[in-house]
């Protein structure tokens, strides 16, 4: 039974300095622990054939399917503000691209598939814990409606990897609209290779921004398109309390997807200064810093594109600055529209921005749980007089008590009835997110006891994040004091 991949590879047709051709390193005993069957079907793959010994070998990198590109992509990047001229796929190999059933080109990448020319001192492998974390969180993000890479499969390798502590090895099959990053442009721009920057820009326009090809200035339209997608993406993160944790330029997707989950986490108690990543000592990538950091990253992209925007560098800089100036308006519009929907506001009033900001301020002052505060407000929309369940979430409800009558007054101006409002609010305010302590418990069960039942259960719960599931009520609960996760780790 042959596993067929309908590859249609475009990135591997670019010049050889865009990547290194390298085969995955075979593993001792591949064991498929999870296959995303609906995603496989969407990609035009046969899930029954993938769910086989041959399929496990392919998904572990032991067998390379016919037609695979098998390349490690080159890129650079600013890591915590410091430029590194060469990073690249140090433990990931792009098998190739397929056209999915929606007509969209998708990358199929093996993460943890062995050393590449970009591995530096790394072993090229991935540990089971980070693989499960990325599988859980990326699929949860998709269910939440956030643009994201996806997880097709997780495979145990039968080998151990040297981490602290030693862990079982695993490989994640990651699906993305592409793995092109801001850092990919930086790789060539930092070397003064304008021809490569132009070739990459042309490839990105054809693949992700075809409308830019028809614009008077295609490269400006490309920059504006990336800015718009990133602004919208970060606004979506802010609606669900998501903290990426490592927003380096090499982790900023040109396609506008969330990528490289590493030390990501979700906020419990609302605090804009929240940081979980063990390596983010200065809070550079704290929850509230994510919008300005996104703009900082986009500015690095704009610097790469300046020579394409005008033959005159000064004029090119001016054009780029004007484009970057649009980020704030785009982000603020998406952010405020998202907050309005979360508060049940279908129309717009001048005081809405202040109303939303004051609710967040009340949550911060009262140390309320971010996700549950919005969800309980949704539940209360059927009877706005009774906000007791919301109030109970606040350690100090003083600011909330001052805010609540203003919200009641504001929604009274809406034409919607309470039932319709509640329905719409519940569609944007999830009851289930990948709570850090729940994800950690799942990882511990798998790593310490080879027990994947909790992994399957959390995936099932998170696949319906907006629908209350009585038997899984515990997944909605914030952590008890002894359950709190204070730090997350990138796993490399």
UniProtKB/Swiss-Prot annotation:
<dbReference type="GO" id="GO:0000287">
    <property type="term" value="F:magnesium ion binding"/>
</dbReference>
<keyword id="KW-0548">Nucleotidyltransferase</keyword>
<feature type="binding site">
    <location>
        <position position="181"/>
    </location>
    <ligand>
        <name>ATP</name>
    </ligand>
</feature>
<feature type="binding site">
    <location>
        <position position="260"/>
    </location>
    <ligand>
        <name>Mg(2+)</name>
    </ligand>
</feature>
<keyword id="KW-0464">Manganese</keyword>
<feature type="binding site">
    <location>
        <position position="124"/>
    </location>
    <ligand>
        <name>ATP</name>
    </ligand>
</feature>
<protein>
    <recommendedName>
        <fullName>Protein nucleotidyltransferase YdiU</fullName>
        <ecNumber>2.7.7.-</ecNumber>
        <ecNumber>2.7.7.108</ecNumber>
    </recommendedName>
</protein>
<dbReference type="GO" id="GO:0070733">
    <property type="term" value="F:AMPylase activity"/>
</dbReference>
<feature type="binding site">
    <location>
        <position position="260"/>
    </location>
    <ligand>
        <name>ATP</name>
    </ligand>
</feature>
<comment type="similarity">
    <text>Belongs to the SELO family.</text>
</comment>
<keyword id="KW-0479">Metal-binding</keyword>
<keyword id="KW-0808">Transferase</keyword>
<dbReference type="Pfam" id="PF02696">
    <property type="entry name" value="SelO"/>
</dbReference>
<feature type="binding site">
    <location>
        <position position="123"/>
    </location>
    <ligand>
        <name>ATP</name>
    </ligand>
</feature>
<keyword id="KW-0067">ATP-binding</keyword>
<dbReference type="InterPro" id="IPR003846">
    <property type="entry name" value="SelO"/>
</dbReference>
<feature type="active site" description="Proton acceptor">
    <location>
        <position position="250"/>
    </location>
</feature>
<feature type="binding site">
    <location>
        <position position="251"/>
    </location>
    <ligand>
        <name>Mg(2+)</name>
    </ligand>
</feature>
<dbReference type="GO" id="GO:0005524">
    <property type="term" value="F:ATP binding"/>
</dbReference>
<keyword id="KW-0460">Magnesium</keyword>
<feature type="binding site">
    <location>
        <position position="90"/>
    </location>
    <ligand>
        <name>ATP</name>
    </ligand>
</feature>
<keyword id="KW-0547">Nucleotide-binding</keyword>
<feature type="binding site">
    <location>
        <position position="174"/>
    </location>
    <ligand>
        <name>ATP</name>
    </ligand>
</feature>
<feature type="binding site">
    <location>
        <position position="91"/>
    </location>
    <ligand>
        <name>ATP</name>
    </ligand>
</feature>
<feature type="binding site">
    <location>
        <position position="88"/>
    </location>
    <ligand>
        <name>ATP</name>
    </ligand>
</feature>
<comment type="function">
    <text>Nucleotidyltransferase involved in the post-translational modification of proteins. It can catalyze the addition of adenosine monophosphate (AMP) or uridine monophosphate (UMP) to a protein, resulting in modifications known as AMPylation and UMPylation.</text>
</comment>
<feature type="binding site">
    <location>
        <position position="111"/>
    </location>
    <ligand>
        <name>ATP</name>
    </ligand>
</feature>
